[in-house]
Regions:
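12-transmembrane solute porter fold
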Residues: 19-44, 55, 61-65, 130, ...
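Membrane-interface helix caps and helix-loop-helix hairpins in membrane proteins
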Residues: 109, 173, 198-204, 229-235
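Hydrophobic alpha-helical segments
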Residues: 50, 86, 98-102, 217, ...
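Transmembrane-helix bundle of Major Facilitator Superfamily
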Residues: 2-194, 328, 336, 340-371, ...
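Interfacial helix-loop-helix linkers and transmembrane-helix boundary segments
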Residues: 80-87, 143-146, 201-207, 263-271
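Short secondary-structure boundary/capping segments
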Residues: 12-13, 203-206, 213, 256, ...
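Structural signal for the C-terminal ends of transmembrane alpha-helices
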Residues: 130, 134-138, 193-197, 226, ...
Length: 466
């Protein structure tokens, strides 16, 4: 047996003594990546006013990050398998932190957009590599608890970003939504360089550059098509062209993976029921969460006349409930099983979406979103534990990349679907019946999606005996 094999076997049998502090550091890094989405969204109006950015440029401040993040995550996961997760975590953190500094210093659109794309690339390296470390450091019930904490920080971070974005833009200014990442990133860099175990490389071979380019192009085309569909309609000519281009690129990627001796990923992973179930749940949960956060924050600011800061304060219970539900789900998952927990969580989510339809006003909106968020927080744990619960060490990085990619797919689908469903409410004037009907329609669509997903999850997620 080789030294590498011995180390790998030992790591699998003996829990790493610093695994919980490492989880805390990696979770904080993931929180920073998730916060960067909603914090920036809240600060967009202030950026536009100060830098004289038009609507297209502001859209790309968000889209550029999402495109780079989503399209490169499979590559990030595979590089973690090939070159070592620690090396890729630190490289991603360095790139993200440096890009955050550049974004805060930006005095116009070119530097800001370049920095945002670079942030997304750094996040795409960091996120799947960090998740693969969590999967390899923990096993059994401990893995469920660890994934619960990971999901709590990710899910709660999206809601906390609304509050943090309001506080920063009302205080030191929009640039600090980026500058705040610099000291946090540097502290994490020093701490992780010292504490993150240098796990044996999970896979050998060379990096499949053509495969990485094909899947990145396909994913970027699909995410951009979804973004455009939300703004310009699902039958927009360019959106349809992008959807077709994405399908063609994915087909070419699949064909190349079957031919090349060192593929980027084993396509048989996508034939495993737990992986398929996990990516289905993560996509649905993310789509619903992004959708409800978009709807809730827009309703509170444009329909109830709350400012950005007050909207952030109102979202604080949503963040706390999400984090508590995810942490709790990680503790009970082994006892009740993923299938039962997913169905219950989706039923709770659907019930929460109905509250703003049946009652109107700020209290009803916050209550409904909080109830829905409790179900969604649990779903993130179910998704991660189902997809990653039994992966081999050499597949941890690429499988984490797949899960993370479908997280971004879900976010893009959620934003596009909600934007379309609520178009009447968003276009209408504040306080009119048309606006209220538009929001009701969007929440009814979300309710239907959650209910349908519960039925699919009951069939798709393996039972505990399988």
């Amino acid at each position: 047996m080789s030294d590498t094999e011995t180390a790998g076997t030992h790591a699998a049998q003996t829990p790493h003594p610093r695994r919980w502090p490492v989880l805390g550091l990696l979770g904080l890094a993931q929180l920073m990546l998730i916060l960067d989405i909603t914090v920036v969204a809240i600060a967009l109006p202030h950026m536009g006013a100060e830098l004289d950015l038009d609507r297209a440029a502001l859209t790309w401040v968000v889209s550029g990050y999402a495109l780079a993040f989503g399209s490169l995550m499979l590559l990030g996961g595979r590089t973690a398998d090939l070159f070592g997760a620690k090396r890729i975590v630190l490289a991603g953190l360095v790139l993200f932190t440096a890009a955050s500094l550049a974004a805060g210093l930006a005095n116009g659109a070119p530097l800001l957009l370049t920095a945002r794309i670079s942030q997304g690339a750094g996040a795409a390296l960091l996120s799947p590599a960090a998740l693969s470390v969590v999967v390899r450091l923990f096993d059994g019930e401990e893995r469920n608890k660890a994934l619960g904490i990971w999901s709590a920080l990710g899910g709660g971070g999206a809601a906390l970003g609304v509050l943090l974005g309001g506080l920063i833009t009302a205080g030191p200014g929009w640039a600090w939504v980026f500058f705040i990442n610099v000291p946090v990133g540097l502290i994490l860099l020093v701490a992780l360089a010292r504490m993150l175990p240098d796990l044996p490389r999970a896979a050998t071979g060379s990096l499949d550059v053509p495969g990485a380019a094909l899947v990145a192009a396909a994913t970027a085309a699909l995410i951009y098509a979804l973004i455009r569909a939300g703004d310009h309609g699902w039958l927009n000519t360019l959106s349809l062209v992008l959807f077709a281009a994405a399908a063609a690129a994915y087909a070419a990627f699949a064909a190349w993976q079957r031919r090349t001796p060192a593929p980027l990923m084993d396509l048989r992973l996508l034939g495993r029921r737990p992986v398929v179930a996990g990516i289905f749940v993560i996509a649905v949960a993310t789509a619903l969460m992004v959708g409800v956060f978009f709807l809730g924050s827009f309703y509170l600011q444009n329909h109830q006349d709350h400012g950005a800061l007050m909207t952030g304060v109102l979202f604080l219970p949503v963040a706390l409930v999400t984090m508590a539900a995810a942490t709790g789900a990680g503790r009970v998952l082994g006892r009740h099983g993923a299938r039962v927990l997913a169905v219950v969580a989706l039923a709770v989510t659907a019930a929460g979406f109905l509250v703003p339809v049946l009652w109107s006003g700020t209290t009803a909106m916050v209550t409904g979103v909080s109830i829905a968020a409790s179900g969604l927080g649990a779903l993130f744990v179910v998704a991660s534990a189902t997809a990653l619960g039994h992966v081999a060490p050499h597949e941890a990085g690429v499988t984490s990349g797949i899960v993370s990619t479908f997280h971004e797919f879900g976010a893009s689908v959620g934003a596009a679907a909600v934007s379309s469903a609520a178009a009447a409410g968003i276009a209408a004037h504040t306080g009119t019946a048309t606006a209220a009907a538009g929001f009701d329609d969007a929440f009814l669509v979300a309710t239907g999606i959650a209910a349908a997903a519960a039925v699919i999850a009951l069939w798709l997620i393996p039972s505990r005996s399988e």
